[in-house]
């Protein structure tokens, strides 16, 4: 059996004296797309941030390719380079005078460890290919200050794609996209997992899209209420356990 790209065992996170995430365990295999679903305040973003070392975890372990990750601080550069993370609210100062090409190129630069003039040809080609994949090549010369919300999301996704990764983590990345853009987005994720073997972990509120596109689902409401295939995890009884009976009744009548 192959080693999981990422494995989480008994992870618990506290905010002050309250456990926002408690005793969560799951594993991600290469070439799979896993969704985290649950109501607002369920701990979905907290779980992601604890895995990445942005938030401290009270207990539990996180393993990367079978090796335990430290509970102290952020991930090592070696691990970080293999993970792309697109948070729900990616805030940056739009007054920074850089173009989309320059923003995406930052994802190629090995966390600033390489000289900026090294491998310029490969760098330019990687940026071009990343922008092509998200249908944003025409935005390359645009200053980031001029981008719309949807264009900004495409540029940030290109930043994630500009170099090979093992894991892509997305927090409501498809929110705000129109129907065609959303379809293209999920087609891109399918290509990443099928052709390049990326593992994908995404937070989503769109249960219909999760059912259609994801391989596994984690149902979270502080605890991991269930996990499995979409057909199993999104069955009515499990949705009641995660969201409550009123939510399921609303979906049934709408």
Question: Where are the predicted features?
Answer:
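H-loop/switch region of ABC-family ATPase nucleotide-binding domains
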Residues: 204-205
């Amino acid at each position: 059996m192959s080693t999981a790209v990422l494995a989480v065992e008994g992870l618990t996170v506290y905010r002050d004296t309250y456990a926002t995430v408690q005793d969560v365990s799951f594993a991600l295999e290469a070439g799979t797309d896993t969704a985290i679903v649950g109501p607002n305040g369920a701990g979905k973003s907290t779980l992601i941030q604890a895995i990445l070392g942005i938030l401290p975890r009270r207990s539990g372990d996180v393993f990367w390719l079978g090796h335990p990750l430290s509970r102290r601080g952020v991930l090592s550069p070696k691990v970080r380079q293999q993970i792309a993370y697109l948070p729900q609210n990616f805030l940056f100062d739009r007054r920074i005078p850089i173009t989309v090409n320059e923003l995406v190129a930052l994802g190629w630069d090995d966390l600033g460890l390489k000289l900026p003039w090294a491998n310029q040809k490969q760098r330019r080609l990687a940026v071009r290919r990343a922008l092509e994949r998200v249908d944003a090549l025409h935005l390359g010369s645009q200053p980031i200050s001029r981008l719309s919300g949807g264009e900004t999301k495409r540029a940030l996704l290109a930043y994630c794609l500009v170099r090979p990764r093992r894991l892509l983590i997305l927090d409501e990345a498809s929110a705000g996209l129109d129907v065609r853009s959303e379809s293209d987005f999920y087609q891109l994720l399918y290509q990443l997992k099928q052709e390049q073997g990326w593992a994908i972990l995404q937070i989503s509120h769109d249960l219909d899209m999760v059912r259609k596109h994801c391989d596994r689902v984690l149902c979270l409401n502080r605890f991991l209420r269930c996990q499995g295939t979409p057909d199993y995890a999104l069955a009515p009884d499990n949705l009641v356990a995660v969201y409550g009976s009123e939510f399921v009744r609303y979906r049934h009548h709408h």
